[in-house]
Amino acid sequence: MSLSPWGAVQRGDPESRLHGRAAPGAARPPMVVLGPHPNPAEAAEFSCVNLGDSVRVSLMLTPRGRGPFGEQLQEILVKAKAILRQQGAPMTVTFQTVFLRDAADQPECERILGTHFGADLPVTNYVLQPPCCGAAVTFEAWAIGGDSVRVERFGPQALAVAYDSIRWVYCGGLQPGAAPVGAYAQMTSLLERMRAALSGAATDFEHVVRTWFYLGGITEPEGARQRYMEMNRARADFYREISFGRSLLEADVLHGTYPASTGIGMRGTGLVGGCLALQTRREDAVLIHLENPQQTPAYAYHSRYSPQSPRFSRGMSLVLGDYITTWISGTASIVNSESRHGGDIQRQTEQTIDNIERLMGPENFAAHGLRSVGATLQDLAKVRVYVKRQEDFLKCKAICERRFGRVPTIYAVADVCRPELLVEIEGVAFSPCAPPARRRSA
């Protein structure tokens, strides 16, 4: 299956391609429905997103027991299976991230997941980030179901999902080869493997909308620089030859700059990566990269933050039919380009959530050319919270629960890219809009 990227949408003011929207402030039904939880005070363990002819389910699961590793993982899998059986259509788990407390548990984890899923094993990232709750493992997954959904596998590290004239490609579990030493060489090797995985699934980097990079020792020195800076240098060099959205311009459509992304620490000295790519022929597709009006774009940072600035957008939104999907990059307590509220986890958490709220709010969408659309914190289908220090977990969690409500959330201990930053948050939101105008056929 070969599809042209993003969709054929006319270039120019994106507002001109949307019509018939409800007036600002008009009531709209929520797209994201939160699942129940045994404890109503806790965040939901899953959310469902109805996309018309398909349903997506976001699973964010933590075991209640604290027994042996295998028992904790089996508890999660039993719970996931029960949730997916409740849906109105057969569901396929496509992409999952497993957060591990101990690297020694990964072989057992791989064995159990291999037995559980068999030939239907999803693309999987294994990340050495201890769950803040004290469990040995937590589990995030996306599942999809629907009459038109088709799943195609390209080995353990790439999978494609097609429905409604859209094709998504998930790549994950990617690591550098054995030879590379140092963050620059590790990142270069990983990106080459990511390119190969995308190619094997009949797509390429120009279609990528979201990336994740988990770097061991992210703030540790490496020569005269920090490992994160070296990772950024490699990414900038690799991306230099990639025209993100180039084929969009050839198709006379709107394009973005860099994908939304998370670059976060993990235990050890390794590197794990994954990405999401999008292909479609649909004429009503509009892709927009989002920047925060109160933050300097990461790719425009001063060289004092990194010799080569981080190449990612603060967020990426896809307007498709009557809904918008917004991927929120890893976000921290940064205003303009400077860290705020050093040493104060509560104020950093509030600032981080303020940044997310502002990024996907209607005013920012209007500034990007789309009026009367946007998302709120209640439109989030799931959230990940990375906490630098275990002792800050409960203070951070209390603020997240107050601001996010019952949105499914996983908390993991992970170093953030700057020593003074104590928390980083990412998420995905789905919000409604009226159908965009379709382009006249040639």
Where are these regions (language model features)?
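Short, polar/acidic, helix-capping and beta-turn segments at strand->helix junctions
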Residues: 2-442
